[in-house]
């Protein structure tokens, strides 16, 4: 089990991480979400041992994780970290990059291991290609295979699918997260992609300004967000006075409402004017105005700009 106990970290007099504590059980997939600059990447580096803590402790089982002050070579053998810059060797082939840290004593075993990992990340056909000739998305997939090569106990992933095409990313995510579950590899992923959070994480940690402000299942955080900030990490969200939605007569009390939770009705207190319409494939996202406030809602068909409609909650 990984455990962080009240850790803090300062960079150039700015407190980047402040009093963070949480624990992760073996085999769990945990997502870290939050706005850019909230400390997600720094937290992964601290867990890996790349930085020294100002305060607190990090433990993996009975092993204390410490920074470069205590280790000549930072990082732990049983933990693998995939940074956003990939760190591939450009002048060696894809298969050589993936097998870089595997022993050469049992060459057939090494060859088989590399082949299976390249199949996992759908890069088998590029095995003999030098890394410098790959696209950013292809390099990212190779880097992912490489950190899995030695089958770590804990995997730290920083935006691991950010450069991969959408049509390929969905299947790749399913393959990788299924593999991690099958092998009981604990994983922490820092991401901006709500699909990675909702579909694959067992728990989600929400960060804001270097602090952990929420830890819960992704389903709970999505359905019952503690704040507009948390809800906004999953997509567009509206803050609507409850009396406009027939909840109460208290105009100061607001309800967080996602676009899919609103629908057009014949009449209601929420009268909006259509400002813009965005085609989303199976529906339109409508941007509208209510008393100088923006309200987003989904609609099955396009609406002309300036159209007045009434909204209420989907029953």
Which role fits each region the language model picked out?
Residues 12, 248-315:
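Non-catalytic connector elements of ABC transporters
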Residues 48:
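Helix-to-loop junction immediately C-terminal to a conserved catalytic motif
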Residues 65-80, 104:
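ABC ATPase NBD coupling module
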Residues 109-126, 178:
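Conserved ABC ATPase "signature" region
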Residues 130-134, 138:
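Conserved ABC ATPase signature
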Residues 149-153:
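A short, proline-enriched helix->beta-strand linker immediately N-terminal to the Walker B motif
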Residues 209-210:
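Conserved ABC ATPase "signature" C-loop
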């Amino acid at each position: 089990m990984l455990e962080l106990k009240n850790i803090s970290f300062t960079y150039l007099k700015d407190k980047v991480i402040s009093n963070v504590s949480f624990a992760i059980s073996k085999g769990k997939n945990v997502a870290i979400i939050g706005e850019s600059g909230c400390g997600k990447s720094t937290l992964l580096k601290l867990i890996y041992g790349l930085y020294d803590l100002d305060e607190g402790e990090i433990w993996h089982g009975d092993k204390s994780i410490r920074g470069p002050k205590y280790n000549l070579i930072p990082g732990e053998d049983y933990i693998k970290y995939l940074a956003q810059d990939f760190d591939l060797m450009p002048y060696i082939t894809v298969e050589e990059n993936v097998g870089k840290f595997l022993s050469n004593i049992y060459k057939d075993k090494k060859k088989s291991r590399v082949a299976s990992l390249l199949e996992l990340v759908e890069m088998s056909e590029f095995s003999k290609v030098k890394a410098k000739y790959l696209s950013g998305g292809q390099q990212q997939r190779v880097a992912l295979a490489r950190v899995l090569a030695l089958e770590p106990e804990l995997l730290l992933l920083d935006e691991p699918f950010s450069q991969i095409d959408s049509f390929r990313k969905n299947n790749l995510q399913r393959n990788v997260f299924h593999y991690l579950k099958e092998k009981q590899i604990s994983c922490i992923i820092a991401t901006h992609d709500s699909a990675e959070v909702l579909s694959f994480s067992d728990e989600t940690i929400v960060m804001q300004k270097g602090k952990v402000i929420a830890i819960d299942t992704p389903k709970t955080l999505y359905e019952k967000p503690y704040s507009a900030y948390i809800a906004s990490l999953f997509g567009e969200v509206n803050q609507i006075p409850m009396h406009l939605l027939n909840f109460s007569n208290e105009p100061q009390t607001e309800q967080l409402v996602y676009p899919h939770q609103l629908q057009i009705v014949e009449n209601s207190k929420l009268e909006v004017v259509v400002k813009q319409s965005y085609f989303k494939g199976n529906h339109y996202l409508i941007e509208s105005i209510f008393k100088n406030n923006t309200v987003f809602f989904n609609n099955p068909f396009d609406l002309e700009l300036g159209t007045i409609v009434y909204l209420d909650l989907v029953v």
